[in-house]
Amino acid sequence: NKEDVDKSYIKVGVGGEKRSHVVSEEDRKITAYHESGHAILFHLLPYVGPVHIVSIIPTGTGAGGYTMPLPQGDQEYITKAHLLNEIKVSMGGRIAEKIIFGNFTTGASQDIKMASGYARSMVTKYGMSENLGFINYESDDQEEVFLGKNLGHTKPYSEKIAAAIDEEVKQIVDECYR
């Protein structure tokens, strides 16, 4: 049934809900506005919505809540506009906190990681950089996952290119935040 499918979707997507976790009223309020920020942008921006589930119940992965879009099926190709809107949605929680409370919390740390990852992939993997062009700056072994993977590892590009990549990633994230 739909309820079982939703529970499975939540467990896979956010590690399940941690209902035993005691949350203060203040933290619950912050989480509610934070998740509302994501939900509003999912609703307003093309390619990324619509919203399927919004929850302020803490997750097994440590998040205070979550906002999940309705699954759009298997997508073979994702456009630059879609990735930019994913970055914007990931910033929605922090923006909502700033608007409502005049400040923001550490609650957006995973959102920041996601936004940075999307922007870096756009520049280094997908050739979507205006300044660095249609070039892949990732080496095949960058996808290896093991402790110490960077020991003795050299990048397949110069320090000048590394600085340009960092600058381009920052520029994409900054433009999406505005």
What does each of the following model-derived ranges do?
Residues 29-33, 39-178:
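Soluble catalytic regions of large protease machineries
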Residues 8, 17-18, 43, 101:
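Intrinsically disordered, low-complexity segments enriched in polar/charged residues with Gly/Pro
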Residues 1-12, 94, 112-116:
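AAA+ P-loop ATPase catalytic core
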Residues 1-4, 11-30, 126-134:
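C-terminal helical "lid" subdomain and adjoining coupling/linker elements of P-loop NTPases
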